[in-house]
Amino acid sequence: MKISIAMASFNGEKFIKEQLDSFLSQTRLPDELVISDDGSTDSTLEIIKSFSQTCPFPIKVISNTQRLGITKNFENAMKSCTGDIIFLSDQDDVWLPEKISTLADVFNNNPKTGLVHCNAEIVNEDLASTGKTVWESTWFSHKEQQKIKNGKAFDVYLRHTVAAGMSMAVRADLLKTVLPIPDIFSIHDVWTALIIAAIADVTLIDQALLQYRVHGVNQTIGIHRLSLKEQFDIARKQACDNTFPNLTALHDNLVKRLEYLIKSGSYTIPVSVMNKAIKRHEHAHIRSSFSGNIIKKLAIMIPQIINGNYFRFSYGIKSIVKDLILR
């Protein structure tokens, strides 16, 4: 079984060497590393070139002549891989030595598994542990973990983004269902997880097999669980920034892609999965349509509360309060 790593890079000179070195420390080395660089203007490409001169496995570097953005840069790396299993990699983390071998064993032992993702330790920019994991900090509950173990990964992913790219590996022969990825900001991992969960099994590994580095540029996942005030401040910012167009576009594209896969006849997608995707799509559109008039909002929200969609596809009371007060 051939292992590929798909890495997206952009101005990563500060940390990329440590990430590359962590590939060398793997108990099971990759068979190739494919890096798509999105027009770095620092020394990133020089660091990669120096690393490649002594690296024991092949490295392919794609230098984009025009900036693609995060999503399409990852797609560029993924579609250029030739392995049977593709690991996604950021440019600023550190993989622990057993990461590749542990995830690869799952694919070897479970032919129906299409995607595997693991936990990660959160560290600061100097790699000092914060004592927290990504699953803790993103409120990935034991109930959700159990649902995935029971074959309900698609249900979880519709509501909660828990399959982060840096912790993920996918079976390459399923990439034709994933690509092309819609050109929406930073959705490569969410999209990949949703599509594969609709057509194949997903396996969780409750081990922190990499160090997720939190630093000034990358603050996607916080160091600690957020207080209610911090959550409120973030919700207010999201409401002001109006992030719903991206979410709505994601679910528009998800429904269209699943319909396409069904029509192609190549994959069996349960009717229940398709119905959930459609209902999630409708819920996203409803939430994106709110005006400032509280009476009009309530008239739209109450049916979504009664039918359970706020709890099935959003964050329950938190989302209700956000829509009622902040939007």
Protein language model regions, located:
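Short loop->beta transition adjacent to catalytic acidic/histidine clusters or analogous donor-positioning motifs
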Residues: 2-3, 24-35, 43, 56-60
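Short, well-formed alpha-helical segments that are part of the catalytic scaffolds
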Residues: 12-25
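Glycine-rich, basic loop-to-helix element that forms the pyrophosphate-binding segment
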Residues: 64-81, 86, 102
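Conserved nucleotide-sugar donor-binding catalytic segment
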Residues: 79, 142-227
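Flexible acidic/His/Gly-enriched loops in nucleotide-sugar-dependent glycosyltransferase catalytic domains
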Residues: 100-106, 112-174
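C-terminal subregions of glycosyltransferases and related glycan-biosynthesis enzymes
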Residues: 157-158, 185-186, 202, 211-327
